[in-house]
Design a protein with these regions (language model features):
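An N-terminal boundary/leader segment
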Residues: 3, 12-73, 310-312, 486-492
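Short helix-loop capping/hinge segments that flank enzyme active sites or metal/cofactor-binding pockets
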Residues: 91-111, 274-285, 333-390, 402, ...
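Short glycine/serine-rich loop segments
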Residues: 123-254, 436-457
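Glycine-rich, small-residue loops and helix-cap segments
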Residues: 38, 49, 93, 133, ...
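Residue-level signal for inorganic ion chemistry
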Residues: 49, 71, 247, 282, ...
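Acyltransferase
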Residues: 42-47, 76, 295-319, 342-351, ...
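A short helix-breaking turn/cap at a secondary-structure junction
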Residues: 212-303, 322, 344, 475, ...
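Acidic/His- and Gly-rich active-site-bordering loop/insert found
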Residues: 81-156
């Protein structure tokens, strides 16, 4: 990066020593620690992130609504609390972003559709309120595909979000705005949602970490579309950040029961003891036997296995039976049932929909419409395959596998030739969809970079309610991997 393009360094001693233009970017926990020690001001941190939004958002198109004066007002209040010696939370003064399908008071909550254009949230979703209670400064909201129905982020309201590693490629979807903002240092962390890979795939594409929790572990109250029916089995909200430790802090802050979400469960956060973690056998597979993956994706899984083995973990080849059945059942829930649920909202407005959403609904239209009997059969089928895989995972309660068949793809691509086989758009993401259908927690962590300079992540998957375990394994993997540099700043 040329000196002419380098952002001016702050006079603050912390920022002079390690500016956010260098890699790796500071973690949310590091920022919070420096604020508590009075080595950096919350106002300075907020200004720095606002400067980065101003500089990089025009090329990334990650943020769609942010209010600098409101951000600075939050930061001044955080600074006052520090100067007064008040007790502060674990995220005090840390700037976070929120996906624009989750309510943030005074901000747009449009879910990328013209049918909700101009909709402003009147109050914070409970998870946002919990982040504020922990001291977070909310920067604003980030871009999504229309109605969250795509694995890339583009819509007719705000346009396309680009990947900070390569602007000609997608940041993923549907939490693509979040992933791009966090990877490029516009935000220190944030919140996405995931009904079929929408946290994990953007995290994989952008080289950050993201957790899809068990349904009900974090309340989805205040999210649009609302969680209910089949969606309550699949869709969740979850944390995204640059490090596993940051993901864990965000998870612990947001987790807990809320009466606005019928699926929310009062499950306490349970720390994992080192011996308990070390006693767990980890299974891994490089592909599912149906959809091939790129060589660099295989290498990422192999690298993760080597790192854990070198750290003393038992890691064995293991691919549970029933994954293809889970994929087909996911589509019957998410695609067919989703189309039925959202159909009344969309009917008569087809001309106002984005090309990507029209494409998605053309795929769902090819499937038989659910009757009450077929929906019940699908529901029962889900329970049966879930039991089948859970029994197999008694020996290997933690799995490592690819996140997707490919790294971030070029805008508009719809198929890829992998190992002599054409992989279609809908098939490339099956590695995420299984675990939505099954309700298993899964965290993505970047492991390596492809020959084209694109990040490659892996998934660490556990049994229901085992978020603490998958995060502990991910943290051990992160420690073995070492610091992650993030995207070249000139690409942002």
């Amino acid at each position: 990066m040329s000196e002419a393009n380098r952002p001016a360094e702050s006079k603050d001693p912390y920022l002079s020593r390690r500016t956010m233009a260098t890699s790796p970017l500071p973690s949310a926990r590091e920022i919070a620690a420096q604020i508590r020690k009075k080595e950096i001001s919350p106002v300075e941190v907020a200004r720095l992130h606002l400067d980065r939004i101003e500089r990089f958002n025009p090329s990334l198109n990650a943020f769609v609504d942010w209010k600098p004066e409101a951000v600075l007002a939050q930061a001044r209040a955080a600074e006052k609390a520090i100067l007064q010696g008040d007790d502060v939370g674990p995220l005090h003064g840390v700037p976070l972003s929120i996906k624009a399908s989750i309510d943030v008071a005074g901000h747009r909550s449009e879910a990328g559709t013209r049918l909700r254009a101009g909709y402003m949230a009147a109050e914070d979703a409970p998870l946002v309120a919990r982040l504020r209670t922990a001291g977070a400064v909310i920067l604003g909201v980030t871009n999504t595909p229309e109605l969250l129905m795509a694995w890339e982020t583009d819509n007719l309201l705000y346009g396309r979000t680009n990947n900070p590693w390569d602007l000609t490629r997608t940041a993923g979807g549907s939490s693509g705005g979040e992933a791009a903002a966090i990877a490029a240092g516009l935000s220190a962390g944030g919140v996405g949602s995931d009904g079929g890979g929408s946290i994990r795939e953007p995290a994989h594409f952008c080289g950050i970490c993201g957790l899809k929790p068990t349904p009900g572990r974090i309340p989805s109250t205040g999210h649009f579309p609302k969680s209910g029916g089949p969606f309550a089995l699949l869709g969740v909200v979850g944390p995204m950040a640059r490090t596993v430790g940051d993901v864990q802090v965000l998870f612990e802050t947001m987790a807990g029961w809320d009466d606005g979400d019928p699926s929310a469960a009062p499950v306490d956060v349970r720390p994992i003891q080192e011996k308990t973690m070390r006693d767990v056998a980890v299974g891994f597979f490089e592909d599912d036997g149906r959809t091939p993956v790129t060589q660099e994706t295989r290498s990422a899984v192999q690298g993760a296995v080597s790192l854990l083995s070198n750290a003393g973990f038992r890691v064995d080849p293991f691919r549970p039976e029933g994954l293809e059945e889970a994929r087909q059942l996911w589509w019957k829930f998410f695609g067919t049932a989703g189309g039925m649920i959202q159909g009344p909202m969309l009917r008569g407005h087809e001309s106002e929909l984005s090309p990507i959403l029209r494409e998605f609904y053309s795929w769902t239209a090819a499937e038989p419409v659910h009757s009450g009997q077929s929906l019940l059969a699908t529901w029962l089928g889900r329970d049966e395959v879930r039991e089948k895989i859970l029994v197999q995972m008694r020996k290997y309660p933690v799995l490592i596998c690819p996140t997707a068949a490919i790294p971030a793809f070029r805008h508009g691509e719809r198929e890829w030739l992998i190992e002599g086989k054409t992989v279609k758009y809908l098939d490339a993401w099956s590695y995420c969809e299984w675990f939505n259908l099954l309700g298993f927690p899964a965290v993505v962590i970047p492991i390596t970079v492809s020959p084209e300079g694109l990040p490659i992540g892996v998934q660490i998957v556990g049994r229901p309610w085992a978020e603490e375990m998958v995060l502990a394994i991910a943290a051990a993997l992160e420690e073995g991997r070492g610091p992650w540099a993030g995207p070249p700043i000139e690409h942002a």
